[in-house]
Swiss-Prot record:
UniProt keyword Transit peptide present: yes
Domain of life the protein comes from: Eukaryota
Gene name tied to this protein: ACADS
Residues annotated for substrate binding in this entry: 161, 269-272, 393
Gene Ontology biological process terms in this record: butyrate catabolic process; fatty acid beta-oxidation using acyl-CoA dehydrogenase
The protein's name in its UniProt record: Short-chain specific acyl-CoA dehydrogenase, mitochondrial
Biological source species: Bos taurus
Amino acid sequence: MAATLLARACGLVRGAPWPWGWRRLHTVYQSVELPETHQMLRQTCRDFAEKELFPIAAQVDKEHRFPAAQVKKMGELGLMAMNVPEELSGAGLDYLAYSIAMEEISRGCASTGVIMSVNNSLYLGPILKFGTKEQKQQWVAPFTSGDKIGCFALSEPGNGSDAGAAATTARADGDSWVLSGTKAWITNAWEASAVVVFASTDRSLHNKGISAFLVPMPTPGLTLGKKEDKLGIRASSTANLIFEDRRIPKDSLLGEPGLGFKIAMQTLDTGRIGIASQALGIAQAALDCAVTYAENRSAFGAPLTKLQAIQFKLADMALALESARLLTWRAAMLKDNKKPFTKEAAMAKLAASEAATAITHQAMQILGGMGYVKEMPAERHYRDARITEIYEGTSEIQRLVVAGHLLKSYRS
């Protein structure tokens, strides 16, 4: 699969550039020399996003429509299982490759980016790390092709950031576990064929009593809530999962009883690299849009790009974007080298998400009234960016993580 993915780098045909929103990148990646394989991957993903995602992004956003055909094609390219070993039908690539691909896909369509991110890092990731050989065959291999996707159920209506306070319970009963409770804000909920769900097996132990389970979808005893009508990433479904005495086999347990909180936290570390990369893609798309518009729009007898006020905005946007990209790549490379990366992933996610929010804001400002209408992609980028500061750990949580590691390093 990895060989197929990289071979196609030279096979996709470039489309014509679009007038508002897609600019060829010439210097953005020159700050770090990427390996040739990663450069090929980047070009493959960029061409795919240009050809398959950018043209449909506005429509799927408007219709709240899951991009099923595009996700299937991404599966064929290996993008839905990038870090899965080839023996399990994955691409067998590293996390730097995953970050690069996530940015390019999200640059074309942020909704498609988060669909890809959840399947790769939140669903497949914990099963690869903590699952048995049998679980990997059952729950990983069928989810690599784009035909099936998974989701991740940690948050609840009464808790989001406090993951250890799960009200959902899993009760042992003979050869089964019985799940009861409601999970909230579940990305991919309506399209998913399986979920990694976290529930309390011993409430007296708080986070040490949380366990993780693998559950097929749809299934009796599991009801989907309504699709949330969201501000952004509207082509990706978000809904509650309601478990009503859902009975699952004992071998549905992922890892050991009480290991769920550790599984969740380690999974979110990797997920934050994915969301940081999604934010980079949104920010890059907004910068593309702003520069294209400013070069073609005249004021006071000259293009907007001749105005110092606009140049200052563009400089600040580029600075924030490239700084966040380097932090994100650093976190990915630390993970690839099996070094601690929790702090760096939090820094990357914080920097990239806040950069995306700021850059999309300034892009709208540069476009003026044209940035406020749906004929231009700037308003969609603005809407899509906001969630990156909330899901997979709010900006406030990221600051707590960074500060905790910083203070610990000074005290040691």
